[in-house]
Swiss-Prot record:
EC number: 2.8.4.4
Protein name: Ribosomal protein uS12 methylthiotransferase RimO
Gene Ontology BP term (one): tRNA modification
Residues covered by the MTTase N-terminal domain: 1-117
């Protein structure tokens, strides 16, 4: 019995996919990379924004075609789209044989058995349920880095975001389970752990009554084989001195923080339901750069939010110029049904959203190149990710670069390097968002 699996959306969704793959493999099913020969296809979906929703629907319909042309006996849809649009999917896509909600992935093998038995079925647990399933995750990222999801859900309820309704309230994974999972990943060859959640900085508050991310980091740093630990999805108002101290004192933790701020205008931040303001953001970023001079800061912004005036946009542009983020992504606002922002007046046209996005990225482009040029001559520790077609050129990442979202360094060397290997590289040239260097 062959199973083909597609994982869409964010890295948090990917972790769910890897857990399901582990359960499927442990059950004795064969995993295949060829959808045309699959008996069962599982699509783990995303619907965070409109484009993600469309991609998920199109993928489901594309896979459904194999019921006509292939050996497909069952099509299973899991994840956020299944959670949010259960009734619509069942009514409008008859080719779908089963649905699993965002908290039901531990039931995947049971659902597969039912589908193979000819049953159309579904599995939905309480949205605040936290699975305790233990499995040997299938690492799909190449084996040398992996995401560690430390919590599920979110309590922030930003006005543009549907996640709390789909994923439930914030639930921290018990620390002992995370340490056990990290050890398992390390034993499998993982050298870089990337901590993720809808928000990482309040980890532990629900379980232990206080923020426990610093303590978790210390325990993870003690695991043999792990060389890099990277933290993503930090809410700015939750970053405290203890977290900064751990970043400074633990050498395995990359001097890199992903801090999605979304905007810099106080009016827009308030409309978004964000719990910070321009002055606090400037104070935090200034402090981080003072305490950790080589820190690389990544952020993401939303442009074209309802009610965003030209003045708000100019405030954001000036903020980007002054803060000079090492890494930055800009997204146009996506109007999501059942969110407060979708009901707001003064919705911005797509043309204006895209124009403002372009202006911000042009500013960041110049900053990124200047920052890249400043790295020329420096020696950096680089994780090798693979080899390019050209002989002697490898691609890797520095501590400043998270996989899939940041830049790369192209490494020239006479040696034969392996994926996951760490080498010292001298930067010789700067590109727009990438670096070029040599390894002796």
């Amino acid at each position: 019995m062959k199973i083909f699996f597609i994982s869409l959306g964010c890295d948090k969704n990917l972790v769910d996919s890897e857990v399901m793959l582990g359960l499927i493999r442990d059950r004795g099913f064969e995993l295949t990379n060829d959808e045309s020969e699959a008996d069962i296809i599982v699509v783990n979906t995303c619907c965070f924004i409109h484009d993600a929703k469309e991609e998920s629907i199109n993928t489901i319909l594309e896979m459904a075609e194999y019921k006509k042309s292939g050996s497909l006996k069952g099509l299973i849809v899991t994840g956020c789209l299944a959670q949010r649009y259960k009734e619509d999917i069942l009514a409008e896509i008859p080719e779908v044989d089963a649905l699993l909600g965002t908290t039901s992935y531990d039931a995947i093998t049971e659902v597969i058995d039912k589908v193979l038995g000819g049953e159309r079925t579904e599995s939905f647990k309480d949205v605040d349920y936290l699975s305790e399933v233990k499995t040997n995750r299938v690492n799909t990222t190449g084996g040398y880095y992996s995401f560690l999801k430390i919590a599920e859900g979110c309590d922030k309820h930003c006005t543009y975001c549907i996640i709390p309704k789909i994923r439930g309230d914030y639930r921290s994974v018990p620390m002992e389970r995370l340490v056990e999972e990290a050890k398992f990943l390390s034993e499998g060859g993982v050298k870089e752990l990337i901590l993720i959640a809808q928000e990482t900085t309040v980890y532990g508050v629900d379980l232990y009554g206080k923020k426990m991310l610093p303590e978790l980091l210390r325990k993870l740093c003690a695991i043999d084989g792990i060389e890099w630990i990277r933290i993503q999805y930090c809410y700015p108002e939750e970053i405290n001195d203890e977290l900064i101290d751990v970043l400074k004192s633990e050498t395995k933790i990359c001097h890199y923080l992903d801090i999605p701020i979304q905007h810099a205008s106080d009016d827009i931040l308030k409309r978004m339901g964000r719990r910070t303001n321009n002055e606090e953001l400037v104070t935090l970023i200034t402090k981080l750069r003072k305490e950790i001079p080589d820190i690389a800061l990544r952020t993401s912004l939303i442009t074209g939010f309802p009610g965003e005036t030209e003045e708000d946009h100019e405030i954001l542009k000036e903020f980007v110029r002054k803060m000079r983020f090492e890494r930055l992504g800009v997204f146009t606002y996506s109007k999501e049904e059942d969110t407060p922002a979708a009901k707001m007046k003064d919705q911005i046209t797509k043309k204006v959203k895209v124009a403002r996005q372009k202006e911000l990225m042009e500013i960041q482009q110049g900053i990124a190149f200047e920052r890249a040029e400043s790295m020329v001559g420096r020696k950096l520790k680089v994780m090798i990710e693979g080899k390019l077609v050209e002989d002697g050129i490898f691609i890797g990442r520095t501590y400043m670069d998270a996989p899939n979202i940041d830049g790369y360094i192209f490494v020239h060397t006479k040696d034969e390097l392996m994926s996951g290997e760490f080498v010292e590289v001298t930067v010789t040239e700067a590109k727009e968002y990438d670096l070029i260097g040599t390894a002796e």
